[in-house]
């Protein structure tokens, strides 16, 4: 009986390993499980008998891989993973991915039924204390198949081809090496290396069309930090007017007055900093910069300098 329990526990552990990474060699699995390669092969067969499609490939880069089957087998979740899954499903119900809300609620109800009372109370506490703001009416939701295609391509280092429409309505075809998906809550972005432009790009998923994984893979190149790169891109380059401003206050103090992702900062000595931000109109930038609460000067462009001057004249007239 003890041996049966040990074998069952090992098979469960093996399944957890296969779910955690795309490919494992037999030697790696044997080392992690503390058994021989022969035992690993027997346990793989047990998983297949239970309906888990475990694929095996030989040669360089080969190994065992958990594939997609005709039916969806059970997933193994530890307590922390179960709570994380429930929280993510609640957020997805009001998120920016098209058609996911109802499916997320159905999945959440199934998870809630089998969750221990202790974990259920943790999830309920998070839900009761959290309010989710949905996407704006002007935001376009991302299709789930686009999101999944890009996520798999990032994971597997697979080339992607896609149509793309930029801010001005120009349509181009892109050949990409996808690296990372970044979400701001309202929108999804892909940081990728553009093979034709030979440079990194930040692309909005809702502006992509006909997204396809080509089936060919690439070798990962040194990449910038995805969150920082996309943050810089969406704070300025997506707007027709981009301004640089010197604030006469330390960078850490000024940065606290800007919402995340709306500007980039660089120190300009111990008591000043340079801020770069963008907007649809110069007047928006003038008003925004003035409400930060610190003295500043606009370095560029001329349109924003003029807008700040006009706003200053208007405010002076208002207090006569």
Curated annotation (Swiss-Prot):
Per UniProt, residues of the WYL domain are 139-218
Which parts form a coiled-coil structure per UniProt? Answer: none
Q: Which residues bind DNA?
A: 24-43
Q: What happens when the gene is disrupted?
A: No difference in the growth behavior compared to wild type strain under standard culture conditions or in presence of 10mM or 1mM H(2)O(2), suggesting redundancy in the genotoxic stress response.
- List the Gene3D superfamilies: Winged helix-like DNA-binding domain superfamily/Winged helix DNA-binding domain
HTH deoR-type domain location, by residue? 7-65
Pfam families xref list: HTH_11, WYL
Question: What InterPro entries does its record include?
Answer: CBASS_pafABC_assoc_protein, DeoR_HTH, HTH_11, WH-like_DNA-bd_sf, WH_DNA-bd_sf, WYL_dom
The record's section on SUPFAM superfamilies has: Winged helix' DNA-binding domain (SSF46785)
The segments labelled WCX domain in the record are 245-320
Gene Ontology terms, MF aspect: core promoter sequence-specific DNA binding; DNA-binding transcription activator activity; protein homodimerization activity; single-stranded DNA binding
Keyword entries, A-Z: Activator, DNA-binding, Transcription, Transcription regulation
- One GO BP: DNA damage response, signal transduction resulting in transcription
PANTHER family with a match to the protein in the record: PROTEIN PAFB (PTHR34580:SF3), PTHR34580
Supply any other comment. May be part of a putative operon containing two genes of the DinB/YfiT-like putative metalloenzymes superfamily, MSMEG_1357 and MSMEG_1356.
**What does the UniProt entry state concerning the protein's domains?**
The HTH domain binds a palindrome in the promoter of the MSMEG_1357-56 operon.
Please describe the quaternary structure of this protein.
Answer: Homodimer.
Q: Summarize the protein's role.
A: Transcriptional activator. Acts as a transcriptional activator of the MSMEG_1357-56 operon upon genotoxic stress. Controls adjacent genes that belong to the DinB/YfiT-like putative metalloenzymes superfamily by upregulating their expression in response to various genotoxic stress conditions, including exposure to H(2)O(2) or the natural antibiotic zeocin, as well as mitomycin C (MMC), diamide and UVC radiation. Upon genotoxic stress, upregulates two genes encoding proteins of the DinB/YfiT-like putative metalloenzymes superfamily, MSMEG_1357 and MSMEG_1356.
- The identity of this protein, by name, is Stress-involved WYL domain-containing regulator
Q: Which organism is it from?
A: Mycolicibacterium smegmatis (strain ATCC 700084 / mc(2)155)
Query: Its encoding gene is what?
Result: siwR
């Amino acid at each position: 009986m003890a041996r049966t329990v040990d074998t069952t526990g090992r098979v469960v552990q093996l399944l957890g390993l296969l779910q955690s990474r795309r490919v494992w060699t037999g030697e790696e699995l044997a080392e992690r499980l503390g058994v021989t390669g022969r035992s690993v092969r027997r346990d793989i067969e047990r998983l297949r008998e239970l309906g888990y499609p475990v694929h095996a490939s030989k040669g360089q880069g080969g190994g065992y891989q958990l594939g997609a089957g005709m039916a969806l087998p059970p997933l193994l979740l530890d307590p922390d993973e179960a709570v994380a899954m429930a929280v993510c499903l609640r957020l997805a119900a009001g998120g920016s991915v098209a058609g996911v809300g109802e499916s997320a609620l159905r999945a959440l109800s199934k998870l809630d039924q089998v969750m221990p009372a202790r974990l259920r109370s943790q999830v309920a506490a998070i839900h009761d204390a959290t309010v989710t703001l949905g996407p704006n009416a002007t935001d376009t939701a991302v299709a789930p198949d686009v999101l999944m295609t890009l996520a798999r391509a990032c994971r597997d280092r697979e080339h992607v081809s896609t149509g793309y429409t930029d801010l001005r309505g120009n349509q181009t075809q892109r050949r990409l090496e996808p690296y990372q998906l970044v979400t701001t809550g309202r929108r999804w972005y892909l940081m990728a290396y553009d093979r034709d432009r030979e440079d990194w790009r930040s692309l909005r998923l809702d502006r992509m069309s006909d997204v396809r994984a080509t089936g060919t893979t690439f070798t990962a190149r040194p990449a910038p930090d995805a969150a920082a790169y996309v943050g810089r891109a969406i704070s300025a380059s997506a707007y027709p007017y981009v301004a640089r401003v010197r604030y006469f206050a330390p960078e850490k103090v000024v940065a606290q007055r800007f919402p995340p992702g709306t500007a980039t900062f660089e120190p300009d000595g111990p008591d000043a900093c340079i801020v770069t931000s963008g907007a649809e109109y110069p007047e928006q930038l003038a008003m925004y910069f003035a409400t930060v609460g610190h003295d500043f000067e606009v370095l560029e462009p001329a349109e924003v300098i003029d807008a700040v001057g006009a706003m200053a004249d208007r405010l002076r007239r208002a207090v006569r």
